[in-house]
């Protein structure tokens, strides 16, 4: 198409071309000028990345640049992969490595150890064994973290920034080993493991950089919270735990990392990068435990904040067992792509299969639902192409670098096995096929005719199965997606600008994607985190500008004279009012924006002062978040607060507890509130913002918004007609 239409191309003029005309001379001149360049144009490839070479360290910087992934098309990098396999693919003759338990600066080998078998070798080869802590050892780990004998909390942000950059460089040096460990222990393909290492490096460089904007605020004091517990998942065993520990360490906290047991050797490996870079072993401890000892960790008074990436039920259990400890959790997702009649079907299919089957469908952001407008749904050609795309993906052992889909982490996923049964009206476009003896490797599977309410429509599965639903129009698709309990990622495949705007305005999810895949969020480019039951905490995204502020205590300096009214207005206009794209990639827009909350309630207690209430009311109004104010009978605030324009309600605590479910978020003037409030909030999955209000708007206004990332691929096979506005 470009050849026939572009003004510089020969075919544009060839039909009416005559010698001696202006067009003839234009084309002749083009040719002659091009010919003159033949001896000066370089023949050296521009793609020169070579993973066989020693990693080039990156010095500390004030602006983070994302780490490049590996270019696997290059011969030298393919040789590098073969070297990884030679080292990490163990044989039955190899003795498994024994990983000790770390307690501060000491290590001990425990009798109780978890064995890690290579699922790509039919569980017949043991890769390593890792020591598990008992409850007594967990108590020692907690004591060390609380006392901070190495003085990590006394370090400056600049010192921590330098150390985190050094850790990032160490991670870059061990990229091959991290990938090999993920292949052997978790069954990740080389490509999927590679992007994880890049993401972990990005986190190490980004979070201390992002902390500087808060450290430079003139009228606030920032202090570490104390000990942060990071509980990380098996499906991203490298990037996500690195993100959690750096977020904690960046603020001067000591960190205890409890990785998913089935993926923990990866954490032991990358922890060495941080220790070698200068993080004291007393400040970063890695531990795996049994269920009983884990409860000691999650309920310990020494732990001041918990960072979790895992299942929604896990987050609920932790919150309900320890409701007063702040929890920041990225949890489940039942993620959908909507394809309308206005979508590019071929391009959509490419995005759909990559999103559904990458990492064997085990990403929390994976597409497990495809909602297709009827005219496309009933198109036999579309069905054939989708089937062909799914069945064309290479599936099998990760030790074959050509395989795109590898094994699942477990062969005992009861939810997935149940979804592999058909309900009434359903059929298989691509039937399920297990390709190995122990049923770890499931080929991409596509279920057709799934109806809203069916098991596979509403259940998060963590496997390479896509459920296809017929819809009548986009609005119906939006309504169905919004009816789900989750709101992590969501996608639209449509070239219609009106449909894009409607979907963007109405869909309830944290990360939105238009005309591209819905997985693979990149640090600072697409800050990541969901809504509804896909997130617990303050609605602040990992890999975004505000994440690290969650894990420090920020207070007004004594005697602060900041005019909070001016500060709130200024902060809103400069930071919160407008969407922005900090990367400005040509061809893909990545907008980051703040949304007001549906509603919010401020609960006042007799010890709270009215000035704090006025600050909260002003902040909510500036952020366009409707606020109600509730107070105890006998503590009448009507006269003092009537001018704020907020609904005022005098009610006993029991009545307030019953009404909490009606608000998206609860606000208080401090953390010293009745335990019943914490318990009820945990029971109904609500977040209480308990930080004492501060006068600086850049800090305070975070409590009254939620964050959303929108990634929009606006080029058409490399051609760009118009760059859309960021909104």
Locations of regions flagged by a protein language model:
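Short, well-ordered beta-strand elements within core beta-sheets of diverse protein domains
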Residues: 114, 127-132, 148-153, 337-340, ...
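Substrate-binding/gating loop at the entrance of the active-site cleft, primarily
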Residues: 218-271, 587, 594-597, 601-628, ...
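Residue-level signal for inorganic ion chemistry
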Residues: 124, 130, 145, 160, ...
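Hydrophobic face of amphipathic alpha-helices that form TPR/SEL1-like repeat modules
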Residues: 7, 11-129, 147, 559-564, ...
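ALDH superfamily catalytic-core signature
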Residues: 273, 278, 300-301, 305, ...
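Extended, hydrophobic alpha-helical segments in both membrane/secreted and soluble proteins
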Residues: 163-164, 178, 182, 186, ...
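Glycine-rich loop-to-alpha-helix module at the N-terminal edge of alpha/beta enzyme cores
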Residues: 111, 115, 121-214, 501, ...
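Conserved, mostly hydrophobic/aromatic
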Residues: 1
């Amino acid at each position: 198409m470009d050849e026939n239409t572009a003004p510089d191309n020969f075919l544009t003029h060839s039909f009416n071309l005559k010698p001696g005309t202006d067009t003839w001379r234009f084309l002749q001149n083009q040719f002659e000028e091009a010919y003159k360049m033949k001896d000066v144009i370089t023949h050296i490839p521009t793609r020169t990345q070579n993973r066989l070479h020693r990693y080039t360290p990156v010095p500390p910087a004030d602006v983070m640049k994302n780490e490049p992934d590996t270019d696997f098309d290059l011969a030298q990098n393919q040789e590098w992969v073969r070297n990884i396999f030679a080292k990490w693919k163990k044989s039955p003759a190899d003795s498994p490595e024994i990983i000790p338990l770390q307690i501060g600066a000491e290590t001990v080998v425990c009798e109780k150890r978890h064995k890690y078998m290579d699922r790509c070798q039919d569980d017949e080869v043991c890769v390593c064994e890792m020591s598990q802590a008992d409850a007594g050892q967990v108590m020692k780990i907690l004591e060390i973290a609380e006392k901070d004998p190495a003085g990590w909390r006394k370090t400056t942000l600049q010192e921590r920034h330098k150390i985190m950059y050094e850790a990032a460089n160490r991670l870059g040096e061990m990229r091959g080993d991290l990938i090999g460990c993920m292949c052997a222990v978790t069954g990740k393909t080389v490509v999927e493991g590679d992007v994880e290492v890049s993401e972990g490096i990005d986190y190490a460089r980004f979070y201390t950089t992002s902390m500087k904007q808060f450290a430079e605020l003139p009228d606030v004091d920032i202090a570490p919270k104390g000990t942060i517990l990071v509980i990380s998942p098996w499906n991203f065993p490298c990037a996500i735990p690195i993100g959690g520990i750096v977020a904690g360490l960046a603020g001067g906290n000591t960190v205890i990392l409890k990785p998913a047991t089935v993926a923990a050797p990866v954490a032991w490996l990358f922890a060495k990068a941080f220790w070698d870079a200068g993080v004291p072993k007393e400040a970063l401890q890695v531990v795996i435990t049994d269920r009983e000892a884990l409860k000691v960790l999650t309920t310990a008074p020494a732990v001041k904040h918990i960072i979790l990436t895992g299942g929604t039920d896990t987050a609920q259990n932790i919150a309900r067992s320890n409701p007063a400890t702040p929890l920041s959790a990225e949890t489940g997702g039942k993620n959908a792509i909507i394809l309308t009649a206005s979508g590019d079907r071929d391009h959509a299919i490419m995005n759909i299969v990559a999103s559904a089957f990458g990492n064997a469908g085990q990403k929390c952001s994976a597409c497990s639902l495809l909602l297709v407008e009827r005219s496309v749904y009933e198109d036999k050609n579309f069905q054939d192409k989708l089937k062909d795309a799914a069945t064309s993906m290479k599936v099998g052992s990760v030790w074959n670098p050509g395989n795109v889909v590898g094994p699942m982490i477990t062969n005992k996923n009861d939810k997935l096995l149940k979804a592999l049964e058909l309900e009434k009206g359903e059929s298989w476009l691509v039937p399920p096929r297990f390709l190995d003896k122990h049923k770890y490797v499931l080929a991409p599977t596509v279920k057709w005719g799934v109806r809203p309410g069916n098991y596979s429509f509403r259940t998060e599965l963590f496997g390479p199965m896509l459920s296809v639903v017929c819809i009548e129009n986009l609005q119906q698709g939006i309504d169905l997606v919004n009816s789900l309990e989750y709101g992590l990622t969501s996608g639209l495949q449509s070239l219609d600008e009106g449909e894009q705007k409607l979907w963007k305005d109405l869909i309830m999810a944290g990360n939105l994607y238009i005309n591209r895949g819905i997985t693979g969020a990149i640090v600072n480019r697409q800050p990541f985190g969901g809504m509804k039951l896909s997130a617990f905490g303050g609605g602040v995204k990992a890999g975004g500008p505000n994440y690290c502020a969650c894990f420090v205590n920020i207070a007004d300096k004594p005697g602060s004279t900041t005019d909070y009214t001016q500060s709130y207005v200024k902060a809103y206009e400069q930071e919160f009012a407008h969407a922005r794209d900090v990367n400005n990639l040509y061809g893909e827009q990545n907008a980051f924006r703040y949304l007001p909350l549906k509603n919010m309630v401020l609960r006042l207690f007799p010890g709270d002062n009215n000035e704090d209430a006025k600050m909260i009311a002003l902040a909510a109004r500036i952020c366009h978040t409707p606020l109600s104010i509730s107070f105890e009978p006998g503590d009448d605030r009507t006269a003092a607060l009537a001018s704020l324009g907020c609904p005022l309600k005098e009610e006993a605590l029991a009545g307030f507890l019953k009404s909490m479910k009606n608000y998206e978020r609860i606000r208080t003037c401090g953390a010293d509130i009745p335990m019943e409030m914490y318990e009820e909030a945990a029971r109904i999955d609500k977040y209480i913002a308990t930080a004492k209000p501060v006068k600086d708007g850049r800090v305070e206004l975070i409590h009254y918004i939620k964050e959303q990332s929108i990634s929009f691929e606006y080029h058409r096979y490399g051609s760009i007609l118009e760059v859309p506005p960021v909104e």
